[in-house]
Every structure is written in structure tokens, then in C-alpha cells.
Amino acid sequence: MYNEIINYIKNKNVAILGFGREGKSTYKFIRKHLKDKMLTVLDQNKNATSDINDDNLILINDNYLDY
């Protein structure tokens, strides 16, 4: 089942809406299987990803629901 999910998202643009418990879990899953995948996190908290050092991660927080 995991391989189906990975194959489905590997050539898609991926955005994670919200970086709470589920968002972080999703991020960790994708990073485990697709280490260089560009990801976008949309969260109202400007410090949501402050503890993550990842060059392939974009955080959008101002007006994040407009994207």
C-alpha cells in the first residue's frame, strides 16, 4: 500500500495544509520515502517548521488559505 501512495505522489506537487500532528506525520512519511521531494507547508504559525532544516521545504503562512 505504501508503494502505491509513494508512486502516486512522486511526480506531483505536494502541499501539506496544517503542520500539527497529522501534518508532521505526513512530512515524516514523505521524507522517509522521497528525501528530495519539494514540499510546501501551509500553516498560520510562522514558526511551524522552525525546528526543521530542509532546503526542499517551503513554508507559506500569510494568507495561506488563498493558495
Model-derived regions, located:
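N-terminal leader/targeting and accessory segments in enzymes
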Residues: 1-67
